[in-house]
Amino acid sequence: MLRFLRGFLIRVGIILAFVLIDKSSLAQDNAKTLTIIHTNDLQSRLLGFAPNREYTPFTLGDDQTIGGIARVATVIKALKQKSPETTLVIDGGDFLMGTLFHTIAREESAELRLLHEIGYEAITLGNHEFDFRPRGLAQILNAALSKGDIPALLAANIVFSESDTSDDALQALFKRGVVKPYQIFVKNGLRIGVFGVMGMNAAEVAPFAAPVTFANPVETAKRIVKIFKNDERVDVIVCASHGGVWRKSDQKNWEGEDIDLAREVPEIDVVVGGHSHTFLKEPIMVNNTPVLQAGAEGRYVGVLNLEIENGDVAMKDYQSIAINDSVAADRHIQAMVDHYQEMVNQKKLRPHGLALDQVFAETQFDLTIKEDNSNLGDLVSDAIRWSIDQYEYNPAFPNTRTVIAVESNGMIRDDLVMGKSGLLQVSDLFRVVPLGIGMVDDQPGFALMSFYLTAPEIKKAFEVLTSVHPLKGWDYFLQISGAKFRYNPNRVIFDRVIDIEIADAGGNFAPLDLSSSNKQLYKAGCNIFVGTFIKLVGDFTGGFLRIVPKDSSGKPIENLNTALVDANPNAAGIQEVKQWVAFLDYVRNFEDVNGNNIPDMPAGYRFPQGRIVRVDSWRAALLYKNATAVTWGASGLILVLLLGLVWLVRLVARPLMKNAVASKMKARTSIKTWASSSVLR
């Protein structure tokens, strides 16, 4: 009997072991993997940088340049080749705008053609895709389609105008399915739903998208997720979001619209982010949803490995691959880049007597843009002021001299890096101020404009830096030329500028009379984008910073196109002066110090010139000097509140004091009565 029982137990154990092994194998068979390769904010960076002259795509270890789309191609192709059936390549938007290559986007669509050749499968639209307006974006897409297939373009929260026809060409491409809200990909037996959204912050800095608008990305995501769950029956949900992530003020935690999506729509399994140019070495985990971003400009390629089992999607691991001189360029892709470089020369630069790889200047130091005084900011703003005067200043009429010029940090897109040789090409200089489209000629590049302001309005313009920038960030920091000013961050918002000095024609500075009695007009200059913002800044500051650009007679300018600098007033219409052309012209006129026929960057730009001075003080003189009604009104309100508080305290205290006095008198009376009775006894 014991022998039989022992044999029976052994047989049961063997059967259970086989069952467990079989279940384990089945579980492993059910677990599937998916690799998501991602980039974002490539911004037409097809060459390694910077400087471009030192980019050596086919040799390793001999330059310090980073990026380069042909290097990106090498990495992505190698990763896809390992397991193409389990790999999905996604970009988080802003594949356009930032280099000379985007100037031929409407004819050649180099960026989309290259991304298709590399193997990208899905791309969302960023704010810079709309820099050439909806009609221009339609031209870019049609140009790409005329030359072959393109990746899936995804935009779920775009809203077209029902009354304005200027977005009809783009809407037609949506109706054809060239751009769509989402796409289903099948990889490794998995149904993967990918959709794209534009963040509200990105939409805010896409003024040329009008009349296109954008719906709330979170509400859009909830709607798409329902479709994925109920109709499409997907296994994995990926959101390509051009929303962004930023460090909180504590510099420890994160915030941003990409994080909001993961938190508010937990059904999303992965957020492939963009817009904020944030390099995340590791994903930000929000309720088990990885939020990704790979810096910008092709500096990194991100690789996320997922494991999917029984409906659960989990991150297995993540890797960031740096794109630098340790990666050899893909020869096919580099050949395409070379072809597009020649197209840029033929179509855009030769009319200006330029070439993309032409050495244009040399520098013995780096020029960088900062959220502070910066030598590059000084250079760019000086170039604006100088260039406007080349076309409009007549010494016989002193009021035609440009007194101040301003530029936004958001318009300055790259540093000027000395590198090993110090030689700067046309392409390096273009990358500094590459953005925009003509208001009249519809050609790439923002145009310069000039107008007149009163002294108090100049102060209001500088208050954008002191008061709007702390609330809105990098894009609202201003670089200035022709002026110096001090500000006190402890003063009342919108009235923090203490005083301003402006330079005369000889470069000598003197205080600017900021009183309302000063009726003189001062000529100012900027690009049309910044000018539009200056005109509108009063609207979103409650009227506190209302600025009215005027002509030389003091008449308000209704249409800013009439304020554009005209390169040839004798020709019909307005011949726009592009900022990028003006910038090159300014540099072209620098002295050739060493006699090699190349202009040298002046030593005066080695360091920032300290045009903006922050003075933290609670001294009354620095709190009230040149104060406006904003400060006096706030001070009066505070005084009224203090007096009211004193009155309230006294009002409450009076009956209490009366009660206290009455109690004291009563106590004294009681003591006297007790004392008298004690004596009698």
What are these regions (language model features)?
Residues 28-39, 44-48, 53-75, 117, ...:
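Catalytic centers of hydrolytic enzymes
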Residues 6, 106, 438-439:
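Hydrophobic alpha-helical segments with strong N-terminal bias
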Residues 2-12:
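Bacterial N-terminal signal peptides that target proteins for export
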Residues 11-20:
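Bacterial N-terminal signal peptides
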Residues 6, 86, 119, 189, ...:
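Exposed boundary/loop context
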Residues 27-327, 376-383, 396, 469, ...:
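Acidic, metal/ion-coordinating pockets
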